[in-house]
Regions:
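Periplasmic c-type cytochrome electron-transfer domains
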Residues: 4-7, 11-13, 22-396
C-alpha cells in the first residue's frame, strides 16, 4: 500500500502527472501493467487523442452581450422561481430544477407540462454555465437560448412570450427592476431570459467543498484510499476519462450507449402520445414517428440516421445529489451506473466503440463509485425561494 501511495503521491504534482493537458490513454496506462494492457485494447484513435485533464472548474464564462451584475442575478433568481413564466402559471423553472433535489426534479422522467408527460430525465442546472450545448440532444448553445426553450417549450413551460411579458408588466416591482438592470421602460422576455441565464451562472460547484478539487489544489488528504484507487481506475482500466474529461467531466460530445428505456414507454399512454407528438414536431418522417418508440436523441437536431440514439455526455459533477441517472432515469445509484458500464452498456445500432465490457472486480466497482462521489460537494447547494411580488391593476 505504501508503494502505491508513493507511486501516485499527492497534491498538484499528482494532478500534473495524471491530468496533463496532453494526456493520452497510453500515458495514463503507464501507471501499471494491468492498466497498460487495458489501454492497448482501446481504439487506436482514442489512444492517440489528447484528453483534457480533470481539474477544478475555471471561472464561469460570461458572454459579452450579457454581463453579470448582482441586480441582474437577483432578478433572474426571482424569475427562475416565478410560476408566471409559463403557460398556465403552474410551471416555473424551479419545478423541474429544485434546489433540494440537486437542481433536478428527483424523478425518473420529468413531469412535463400539464396534459403531457415527458420521456427524459430532467438534468441538473448546476454547472450548466460551462456547457457549449444544452439539453440531452444539444439543441441550444447558450443559457440565453436554454431559458426560452424551456419556458416556451410545449412539454415544459408552454408559455406564450407575449402573455408572459404582459404578466410581468402588471407587477410594479418587476417593471422597476427591468428599468434598473436593463434600462428599458417595460419588461421584455429577451431581457428576462438574460436575467435567468445570469442567475444560472451562479449555480456552480464550490471547489473548496469538492474532495477531488481540494486534492487537485494540493490537499493530499482530500481523497481516501478507495477514492484514490477509483481515480486510477477512472483514468485507466475503466476508461471513464475518454468521455468524462476536462474540468466539467464531460467531453460535451454525443454517444450512443444503449441505455434501457424507461417503463413509461411501455406503460404510460400519455408518455407515448407526447413522445410521438414531439417526434412529429421535431420533423421525424411520418412513416417513422407514429410507430417509433425510440428516443432518437441527436437525430432530432441533425436528421442523420447515424446519430440515432446519441445523447450529450453529462457532467459527472454533483452526482451525489442528482439521482436518478441517464437520460431515461433508470438507474438510482452509482453502483447501478458502474454495473451498466462494466457490462459494456446496452444494445443500440450506433453504439459508441468506446463502450466495452470492463471486467471490474467487486472492489474495483466500489472504488470507482467512491471516486465518482468525490466529484461532488460535501454539502448540496441549497437555496430558499425568494419572496415574489404580486400583480397590481393599472391605474386609469
Amino acid at each position: 500500500m505504501q508503494a502505491d501511495k508513493l507511486s501516485i503521491r499527492t497534491g498538484v504534482a499528482v494532478v500534473a502527472a495524471l491530468f496533463t493537458a496532453t494526456l493520452t490513454v497510453d500515458a495514463v496506462a503507464q501507471a501499471g501493467r494491468a492498466t497498460a494492457k487495458r489501454a492497448e485494447q482501446k481504439p487506436a484513435a482514442a489512444q492517440k487523442a489528447a484528453i483534457p485533464p480533470l481539474g477544478p472548474l475555471p471561472p464561469v464564462p460570461v458572454p459579452a452581450d450579457n454581463p453579470m451584475s448582482p441586480e441582474k442575478v437577483e432578478l433572474g433568481k426571482m424569475l427562475f422561481f416565478d410560476s408566471r413564466l409559463g403557460g398556465d402559471a403552474s410551471s416555473p423553472c424551479v419545478v423541474c430544477h429544485q434546489p433540494g433535489k440537486g437542481w433536478g426534479d428527483g424523478d425518473e422522467i420529468s413531469r412535463g407540462y400539464p396534459g403531457t408527460q415527458h420521456w427524459r430525465n430532467s438534468q441538473t442546472v448546476l454547472n450548466s454555465a460551462y456547457y457549449n450545448k444544452l439539453f440531452w440532444e444539444g439543441s441550444v448553445t447558450s443559457l440565453e437560448g436554454q431559458a426560452p426553450a424551456a419556458a416556451e417549450g410545449n412539454v415544459a413551460g408552454n408559455g406564450d412570450p407575449s402573455l408572459m411579458e404582459m404578466r410581468l408588466r402588471f407587477i410594479p416591482e418587476y417593471v422597476a427592476a427591468f428599468r434598473k438592470v436593463f434600462g428599458i421602460e417595460q419588461p421584455r422576455m429577451t431581457q428576462a431570459y438574460q436575467a435567468i441565464a445570469a442567475f444560472q451562472r451562479t449555480l456552480v460547484s464550490d471547489a473548496k467543498q469538492v474532495p477531488f478539487d481540494r486534492y487537485a489544489m494540493g490537499d493530499g488528504k482530500a481523497l481516501n484510499e478507495s477514492q484514490m484507487r477509483g481515480m486510477q481506475l477512472y483514468n485507466g482500466k475503466a476508461g471513464c476519462i475518454l468521455c468524462h474529461n476536462g474540468p466539467l467531466a464531460s467531453d460535451q460530445k454525443f454517444h450512443a450507449l444503449g441505455v434501457p428505456d424507461n417503463e413509461a414507454f411501455k406503460t404510460s399512454p400519455l408518455a407515448q402520445i407526447t413522445h410521438r407528438w414531439q417526434q412529429y414536431q421535431k420533423g421525424v418522417p411520418e412513416a417513422n414517428y407514429r410507430d417509433a418508440p425510440l428516443d432518437r436523441g441527436l437525430y432530432y437536431v441533425t436528421k442523420n440516421p447515424k446519430d440515432i440514439g446519441k445523447f450529450r455526455t453529462p457532467s459527472l459533477r454533483e452526482l451525489k445529489y442528482t439521482a436518478p441517472y441517464m437520460h431515461t432515469g433508470v438507474f438510482y445509484t452509482l453502483e447501478e451506473v458502474v454495473d451498466f458500464y462494466d457490462r459494456g452498456g446496452g444494445d443500440t445500432p450506433n453504439k459508441s466503440p468506446l463502450v466495452k465490457p470492463l471486467a471490474l472486480s467487486a472492489q474495483e466497482k466500489k472504488d470507482l463509485a467512491a471516486f465518482l462521489e468525490a466529484l461532488s460537494m460535501d454539502k448540496p447547494l441549497l437555496m430558499d425561494a425568494p419572496p415574489l411580488p404580486a400583480y397590481q391593476p393599472l391605474r386609469r
